[in-house]
Amino acid sequence: MRKVAIYGKGGIGKSTTTQNTVAGLAEMGKKVMVVGCDPKADSTRLLLGGLQQKTVLDTLREEGEEVELEDIIKEGYRNTRCTESGGPEPGVGCAGRGIITSVNLLEQLGAYDEEWDLDYVFYDVLGDVVCGGFAMPIRDGKAEEIYIVCSGEMMAMYAANNICKGILKYADAGGVRLGGLICNSRKVDNEREMIEELARKIGTQMIHFVPRDNFVQRAEINRKTVIDYDPTHGQADEYRALARKIDENEMFVIPKPLEIEELESLLIEFGIAN
C-alpha cells in the first residue's frame, strides 16, 4: 500500500487535484482510500457525488467511543473509500490535533487493514505546513510520498518551498520523500518553465502540468470529478496522465529547499517580478 500526501498552499486546488487524480487511479482499477485532513471537509465531496459526509471529529463528538468504521467511511466513485477528519468548532481547539485524533482512530478501527486490499491511501492536507498537527502525516510516517500542488504564483512557490523544509526536517525520522511538484496552472507567464526550474533546484521533478480549464469548475458544480462527469473531455485525460505518472513514479527524494533570495531570483529570472 502506497501512502501519499498532497500538500500545497490554501486555495491552490489540492482537494480538486487529489479527487480527480484518485478518480484516474480508480478507473485504472486501483483501490484507494482518501483521508481528508482539512477542517473544511471538502476532500471527498466530488468522489461522493456532492455528499458532505459527517466528519470523524463530529461523529466522535456525537457518538462518544461507540464509533464503528462504517460511521466514518463512505464508498465513493468506483469503490473509493472516503473519510474526512474534520476539525474543531471555529475558535476552539486545534485543527492539527484533530487530524492526529482522526488518523489514530482510523488505525484502531482497522481502516488500513489488509482485508480492504488498498493500493493507495491519499491524505489531502490543509495549506502550508504551519503547525505540527498538519505535519503529522509527514512526521509520524503516515505518508511516505509527498506531492506538492503549486502554480507559478509567488505565494504558491513560497509555500511549496516551506513544505520542502518540513519534509527535510522529518525525512530521516519518518522516511518520507518528495515525489514531485504538480503544477496546477494559473496561466502565469512562463509558468511551466518556472516550475520545472523550481523542481530542478529543489532536486525533484514537475510530475505533471495540469492546464487551467473551466471545465473542472463545471464538473465541480455538478458535484463530480472530471472523469466521472465527462470521461471523453481533454481535461479528464490530463488527470489520467497525472494518475499514471504517480502510479509509475520512482523518483523519491529528500528535497533541498531554496533560500528566499534564490526563490526571488527565480521569480525575477522568469519575469513574474518585473
From Swiss-Prot:
User: What InterPro entries does its record include?
Assistant: NifH/chlL_CS, NifH/frxC, Nitrogenase_Fe_NifH, P-loop_NTPase
Modification comment: The reversible ADP-ribosylation of Arg-97 inactivates the nitrogenase reductase and regulates nitrogenase activity.
Cofactor binding summary note? Binds 1 [4Fe-4S] cluster per dimer.
Q: Which domain of life is it from?
A: Bacteria
ADP-ribosylarginine, modified sites: R97
| Catalysed reactions listed for this entry | N2 + 8 reduced [2Fe-2S]-[ferredoxin] + 16 ATP + 16 H2O = H2 + 8 oxidized [2Fe-2S]-[ferredoxin] + 2 NH4(+) + 16 ADP + 16 phosphate + 6 H(+)
Record-listed ATP binding positions? G8, K9, G10, G11, I12, G13, K14, S15
CDD domains attached to this UniProt entry = NifH (cd02040)
The GO annotation for biological process reads: nitrogen fixation
What is the enzyme's main class? oxidoreductase
Residues engaged in binding [4Fe-4S] cluster = C94, C131
Question: What Enzyme Commission number(s) appear in the record?
Answer: 1.18.6.1
| Keywords, alphabetical | 4Fe-4S, ADP-ribosylation, ATP-binding, Iron, Iron-sulfur, Metal-binding, Nitrogen fixation, Nucleotide-binding, Oxidoreductase
Q: Which cofactor does it need?
A: [4Fe-4S] cluster
What Gene Ontology molecular function terms does this protein carry? 4 iron, 4 sulfur cluster binding; ATP binding; metal ion binding; nitrogenase activity
How does the record describe its quaternary structure? Homodimer.
User: What is the recorded function of this protein according to its Swiss-Prot or TrEMBL entry?
Assistant: The key enzymatic reactions in nitrogen fixation are catalyzed by the nitrogenase complex, which has 2 components: the iron protein and the molybdenum-iron protein.
Q: Which family does it belong to?
A: Belongs to the NifH/BchL/ChlL family.
Q: What is the protein name stated in its UniProt record?
A: Nitrogenase iron protein
The organism's taxonomy opens as: Bacteria, Pseudomonadati, Chlorobiota, Chlorobiia, Chlorobiales
